Amino acid sequence: VTGARQTGKTSVLRHTFPGHRFVSLDLPSEAELAESAPEDFFARHPAPLIIDEVQYAPALFRHLKVRIDAERGASGQWLLSGSQRFPLMREVGDSLAGRIGLVELDTLSDSEVRASIPGTDALSWIVRGGFPELWAHPDIDAREFQRAYVVSYLERDLRSRLQVTNLRSFERFLRACALRSGQLLNKSDVARDVGVSVPTVTSWLGALETSGMVALLEPWFENGTRALTRSPKLYFRDTGLLLALVNVRDAAALADSPLCGPIFETAVYGTLRRALELRGELDSLVFVRRAQHEVDFVLHRGGRFDLFECKWTEVPDPRDAQTMQRVVELLGVSNVERRFIVCRCRHKTRIDAACEVVPLEALPEVL
């Protein structure tokens, strides 16, 4: 189980598998034992076992491979969790390919929050974010929690992983990325604004992806291929953390912010991402941009397309559907199956015969 810090990985595993023993490699003594003397580690912690923050002992994976191969008939003996996805995946690919199942845990979705706390609306979720701790304890100040989260992330993850010596520069980089959430990523612009090189931006951006803080969405072109050399769009994975980084404290401040549109688009991305991950269809999500015409999100399935445009409004303008029509013509009218405008309306409706209007809360239902 991978995912950003504080998404609930440990809680989910311990709640779901109460009969398993538990050890966290966040403890330096346990991590050192697991890395330098794996056999002694397994003798101290026999299966069935949950191993938390397993990325701190990469040598453990080779020894797990031997044990799994020796007990092929006994599934679920070792449950692993880690908050640094890409290094973890490299170790898994080298040692445990074909021997484990992988799950990535995101922060809570809008629908998960509303199912647990009736009466909560999508705007509250956007502003507060999806970290479980914030919804389990509503008295916690969300912005203080998120600021502490950033400080912890800078100190714990970056110092050890990237050997970043100037944390203030990285914090400026983090805020520069937050100001660009929901927009095309131009690394040269970011490098200029922060005062670092483009290779440094590339390295630091990889760290944000690794830790589950941001995601990149690739463009789609009419020849049916992803243009990997073109600019992707950048999205923060949690809107509450995003709002903390751009100093938007509450719903009223969000409504007055010039960033309300990109922030709402980021929330739509998060909703799409969570729903599509559950279905194993995340690779189907792209965006289309050509000659100044863009549709925020496009789902492609078997040569057919669903289009999603995001609007920070309660009543979409019919001209929004006309803008989508230009992209429909680009993709081929017969290839486009459905068109949606996602906005802050209360109920599903139609803007015309071809285009449906849906609230953020109803978005998973139409996928």
Regions found by a protein language model. Name each.
Residues 9:
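Conserved lysine of the Walker
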Residues 12:
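Hydrophobic positions on the alpha1 helix immediately C-terminal to the Walker A/P-loop
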Residues 139-305:
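Accessory nucleic acid-recognition modules appended to NTPase machines
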Residues 107, 117, 344-367:
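Domain-level recognition of nuclease-like catalytic cores that cleave nucleotide substrates
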Residues 300-316:
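Active-site ExK catalytic segment of metal-dependent nucleases
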